[in-house]
Amino acid sequence: MNALAQKTPSPPTLVFTEAAARKVKGLIDEENNPYLNLRVFITGGGCSGFQYGFTFDEAINSDDLVIEKQLEEEDDDEGGTGQMALVKLLVDPLSLQYLQGAEIDYHEDVSGAQFVIRNPNAKTTCGCGSSFAA
């Protein structure tokens, strides 16, 4: 058998859900700056040793992982406009080491709304959800 035929596709480095991308798009629209991208990063600190951070960034560094999500623009009615919007998630190489295989999602329920990171590399997490140990 051909060695190339035996290769299985590798799982995505990071998953950026449609719910998260739609929320980011809405926040970018509120800022009225189409050049903004969402950057997710890891810093030292928090209850468990590391914590997640989010910020908007116009700059894309040459070594950033860039995950693009195409979204159909929504209008006020039930259907879409047919126009597409591109939302970008940026991760620096150091943070990517801790986020490999993670999912960036956005969740709304009766207790509130927040971005959620489901990280398979987190050995323990804090009750606040923004701190973890690797």
UniProtKB/Swiss-Prot annotation:
GO CC entries: cytosol
Top-level division of the source organism's lineage: Bacteria
Binding locations of iron-sulfur cluster: C47, C126, C128
Keywords: Iron, Iron-sulfur, Metal-binding
GO MF annotations in UniProt: 2 iron, 2 sulfur cluster binding; 4 iron, 4 sulfur cluster binding; iron ion binding
Short name of any one Pfam family annotated for the protein: Fe-S_biosyn
Keyword check for Disulfide bond: no
Cofactor: iron-sulfur cluster
SUPFAM superfamilies: HesB-like domain (SSF89360)
Cofactor binding mode and count: Binds 1 iron-sulfur cluster per subunit.
Family: Belongs to the HesB/IscA family.
Quaternary data: Homodimer.
Task of the protein: Required for insertion of 4Fe-4S clusters for at least IspG.
Name under which the protein is recorded: Iron-sulfur cluster insertion protein ErpA
Species whose genome carries this gene: Coxiella burnetii (strain Dugway 5J108-111)
